[in-house]
Amino acid sequence: MAQVNWHLEGEWIKNCNCAYGCPCDFNARPTLGYCKGLVAMHIKKGHFDDIHLDGLKFAAVVEWPGALHEGNGAMQPIIEERASPAQREALFKIFSGKHSADGTLFHILSLIVSRIHDPIFAPIEFSFDMEERTARIRIPGVLESDVEPIKNPVTGAPHRIEVMMPDGFEHRQAEIASATIRSSGAIKFETKASHSSLATVVQTPQGVAG
């Protein structure tokens, strides 16, 4: 399929049930042997062909029975309810991976997710401060997640960890933080003091551009 020109630039949150550092980013197995988590994005600038996506927010709750590369994952996409039908369709086309080069984020997701639950269209509250390592997501009746700095276990002082991934397909640089998650949609789980990555990203059909 011919690739359509698209662009997503904005704030990116990835929270999961793994220990701080997310073993998946190091090609290791998930902390608990399986993965449950979420991604969310506030699109500051975006488009799919001539459809503008500026300002929209989306999220996805995900799970895998083992390591991500082994596949058999499930996903429930969530798009901000104010998105127009054309904008919703544009985002679903991006999520499909059919308009992305091989080995890029959405192409990889299309290979390792075998079940997609019915999408949800709902208000999305999204706050993000990468410097302070704080974030908050609220989707009524579906998802609650808070992010705060990792704390030194002795002094309680904020503990900063920055990860650089020059060849990353999700982001190039991220601040690592501590997440609390309560998911009550099709994929149900709760975590406390688990992994969070906060990043600013630029995704295109050719992958990460910034």
List the predicted regions and their residue ranges.
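Residue-level detector of functional hotspots within protein domains
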Residues: A2-V4, L8, D25-N27, E63, ...
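Short acidic, gly/pro-rich beta-turn/loop elements at beta-sheet edges
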Residues: A28, D49-I51, Q87, V147-P149, ...
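Charged linear interaction tracts used for macromolecular binding and regulation
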Residues: G73-A157
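Extended, charged low-complexity segments
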Residues: I150-G210
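Short, surface-exposed loop and linker segments with low hydrophobicity and enrichment for Pro/Ser/Thr
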Residues: D25-Y34, G66-G71, P119-R138, I176-S183
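Low-complexity, flexible helical/coil segments
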Residues: D50-K57, P77, I112-D118, V163-M164, ...
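N-terminal ordered "arm"
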Residues: A2-F48
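Aromatic- and glycine-enriched beta-alpha-beta binding-site module
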Residues: G33-L105
